[in-house]
């Protein structure tokens, strides 16, 4: 019996020892680098504090540890997922080196500092930031950075390639940079404009004494060496929210907004003594184009009489889409662009540099923030590992009295500043209505004064003010197009354009069937590209489609040029015959005069956004009342109406009608020919793919020694500015077909388009003929394959005649370059069938 008891006891002891060993393995400290580990739990520190020991105690303690059996570590209590670990010593040292700030090390910091670090980590977590922004409003902004040059660089940097990078401070995602520029004579001239789209969150004034507060939106700017990444020239931080505040304050105080900030930052390190010149600007990309920010003074809690950076309290009101407000008349004086007063120039002092040596150690430059931010920098790795959270449902409770006042009428802006007045405070509604009536009376007076100024010719309105209003209108119209898809009535077709009245006298909205798809979500069938050209949706099958469907094919049109009379008169075929005299340089000349932007990999929305943004920036720089942005929208509307007007009648009857009345603008010459051009470029695609039924009638040699039309050209925009007139007008452009279903891959080669028009008894222009042509060579196999692939995929491809195949086999060994062309004339206000012209040999 005693033996059984002793045996069971030994087995229990062995089992207990195994359990203790297993527990120790489970709860022992992981052997992983702490700096790279992330956990999702909040570790609660132990309250026990280790006691101080003497040297004598250490010996006894060491002996006791040798005799004591190691016990398993007690398990930590955790609250998932709320955990934020304090920064490590390595990260603290990096921050000290980069920003030259004195930071305590973890072992030197007290328990209160540890709690502070823990709190910062929690508030920088994306779900928490999403909850904090529930009561805030969001502004969509476009930051424009015009990189001018890096000047006064040391002579030792000549030949070094430099670039400028701009990115959000908290993350490296979405960073943009300039093209490399080589330093020459101590200067690197970039002359490039960068764009970054972002959101700025702010809390509007609540009418209780608290002004509007913006959330910091810092951006990081720095110069870098392309061929020497280890070089550092200094980094600078600009807060976009501060720029918005300054612009709003100056607008409310002086009546003129800040259009541009000139920045000149001193460089450090190897480029000490040099400076980086930039021009910063921003555009509010909201429905109202930013007009509401500068007109609704109560929204930001500011009054026109308040000084800059001194927000006065007021009661903001929100307007419905049907309401309106008349801003106070703007001041006629406008100051020039100004620079923030402080925080820009470098304050670091570095030793001089005589020569550029990449081997010597360089000093770490400090970041020079323009505005001092209280919030810590958010780390890019945190944004990558944490998922994005958005608040999908939120609401704000309103007081019943406020709802009653809002239903009675729009609440006007009131100052909360208390003054001694003998009023009856027992009836706040009565006081509110009196204030409201006073505000409405002021608005009516301002409206009458504006109408009177317009009747007098608008002498009091300056050119810069007209630029502001046109820019706001352009942005508002463009952004409304992006959000009105559910109505399925595009704004392009709702405007009454002269061209639609001249063509068919019938609005596009009257047509019950749609034959053109949109290029993107609610942006229409025509958009302008960044280089000033156009991207046009096509429907070569003439079938009914939905606007939300993806087009099967689009054509990208370059900027138009005009052939001057010095080139001599020439018909369509004669025009291409003389062009062929350039020989092998023909394609390079065409691409230099009528270049097109590369759209591979972009979306329709991105192309449209880049086009309107480029037009707005160009209009700002030129400071013209008739801005390029306004002309962009007008030209897009014209081409959209031309592509849609009369299409249904043409499909039903098969008759190609042309504009009956003379055209008033040279821009309409190409627009009225778009539908015929759509058919002819598809025929040209078949020629490139060797899938055409009819061969060229014969081949001719290029015209040598005659005037080349490409050498006597001028851009259409300059031709209009100089108010030139020609009896016979020839407009040239290039067209590249692209497949939207293949990320806008190029289909076939580039085609040259020539539209000829004549002046009709000083009444206007009349289109007479349309011609297209392109270079076909055996070496360009990719063009032929992409053209054939699209035609076969959509059932429009078929083999050509056997004669063409035999002819091709006979000339297999020869490298031929031919210029093919198609022509179509107008007779009795109708387009005739296009015919194939003789091919022209380029050699």
Curated annotation (Swiss-Prot):
Protein name per the record: Protein PLASTID MOVEMENT IMPAIRED 1
Ranges of Acidic residues composition bias in the record: 456-472
Cellular compartments per GO CC: cytosol; nucleus; plasma membrane
Keyword Cytoplasm in record: yes
Tissue specificity comment: Expressed in leaves, stems, cauline leaves, and flowers but not in roots. Present in leaves in both mesophyll and pavement cells.
Annotated Basic and acidic residues bias: 365-381
BP GO terms, sorted: abscisic acid homeostasis; abscisic acid-activated signaling pathway; actin filament-based movement; chloroplast avoidance movement; chloroplast relocation; nuclear migration along microfilament; regulation of abscisic acid-activated signaling pathway; regulation of seed germination
